[in-house]
Amino acid sequence: PEVFPFSDLAGFPELSVAGHGGELIIGQLHGFTVACMRGRTHYYENIEHGFPKTITRTMKLIGCQYFLSTNASGSLRESVGPGSLVMITDHISFNFNNPLVGPNDEEFGPRFIGMENVYHPATRDRLKASAKSLDLTLHEGVYFGVLGPSFETPAEIRAYRTLGAEVIGMSTIPEVICAHHCGLHVGVI
């Protein structure tokens, strides 16, 4: 595979969160060209908020059709413990900043985009089938996105559960919105 440090790519920031390497890796996997981002920014880092557009548009321009994302998130269900895999079926955003705010580039998508089926049904079916073939338990749930960096209070956790969320985190939603805007088939675990 070819590895491109974010620092060598125009529009890609240096990352400050431990464990986020900051690399674009392109290689072959079972006959398919695969592009992988190692690392992401978070809104709480106060980094340029255009980064979710940059990564998803880069993926679109190099020919990607699918956008699969992973994250470390917290469970709001006692039945889903640490280390569990949860496939996201929808989200609630409390990030307080939509990454599509600002000038729109029609090359990547329309000014206004519907958010139904953001988590592409056929992609979710493939993820479920893959988990089953590997004998992995794959939970499903709604992701609640918060700004961070502080964790939630007990009262907030109760409120988020009441709103229908199963997992919570400080990332993912901005790039999901941008990937959907670009027409990529989104799946998140």
Where are these regions (language model features)?
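Internal active-site segments that recognize and position negatively charged phosphoryl groups
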Residues: 113-134, 157
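Non-catalytic positions within long, well-ordered alpha-helices that form the structural scaffold/packing
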Residues: 60-63, 161, 180
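Zn-dependent metallopeptidase/amidohydrolase metal-coordination segment
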Residues: 170-189
